[in-house]
A protein has these predicted regions:
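Gly/Pro/Ser/Thr-rich low-complexity, intrinsically disordered segments predominantly at protein N-termini
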Residues: 1-228
Length: 228
């Protein structure tokens, strides 16, 4: 998915450079400055503002289109109800600040397994890496969702990542896979269309028709079944 250079390749390139020490020193100074900027961002951020801190910059989000909002609401109905019914964990839509390395994100939907939330404080503002994240594409966010966020989510152990295209009505499902002598990597489980069925691997036994993500009537039908 991402075209970003591999971490090992970047490290090798720096260490092979004759002024590697100067590059590292300059990077350290930049990261110290960025950390101060990030602290100011967190103090400035309020519940009424949707913004993220990505690679040293504050990224503001404009109001979403109706189709984006409908998809987000449909997903929250399904995943929120399923997680509560089976006591699986915590679900957040849009406003949970996620700390991943140097960046702070507010995913469209995030889920944490119950055992990871038992000692959470009700006043906490900054959250650890979720077990499951969903991002809904828009023109302004699609590059970040497919590249910067993809790399961050993968490298910080997010177990499952869905990228949803609300215009094409498609869901791309990525699952974190462990391999011997290698870092965990996302693998594409499949791209699912409106007439297909999708199985969530993190929320055990959740099998949903993709139509329930995009269509209000199909969503209501599926949610009604979940309540039985």
């Amino acid at each position: 998915m991402s075209n970003s250079p591999k971490q090992d390749d970047l490290f090798h390139d720096i260490m092979e450079h004759p002024i590697a020490d100067q590059i590292i020193e300059r990077a350290n100074q930049a990261m110290e400055k960025e950390a101060r900027h990030r602290a100011n961002f967190r103090e400035w951020l309020t519940p009424s503002v949707k913004a993220e801190f990505i690679n040293g910059e504050i990224v503001m989000h404009s109001p979403v289109k109706r189709r984006h909002l409908r998809v987000a609401e449909n997903l929250h109905y399904i995943i929120g109800l399923y997680a509560r019914k089976h006591n699986l964990g915590e679900v957040s839509i849009e406003k949970a600040l996620i700390e991943l390395g140097r960046n702070d994100y507010e995913p469209d939907l995030a889920f944490w397994l119950k055992e990871r939330t038992l000692e959470w404080d009700n006043d906490m503002m900054v959250h650890p890496a979720p077990d499951f994240i969903i991002e809904i594409l828009s023109e302004s966010t699609k590059d970040r969702d497919r590249n910067t966020k993809y790399v961050s989510y993968e490298s910080h152990g997010v177990g499952e990542y869905w990228i949803i295209d609300p215009v094409k009505e498609l869901v791309e499902q990525f699952v974190l896979v462990s391999k011997p002598n290698s870092k965990d990597k996302f693998e594409l489980q499949g791209t699912f269309g409106i007439d297909e069925v999708l199985t969530c691997l993190v929320l055990k036994d959740l099998v949903l028709p993709v139509a329930a993500i995009f269509d209000a009537q199909e969503n209501m039908k599926f949610v009604t079944e979940l309540t039985k």
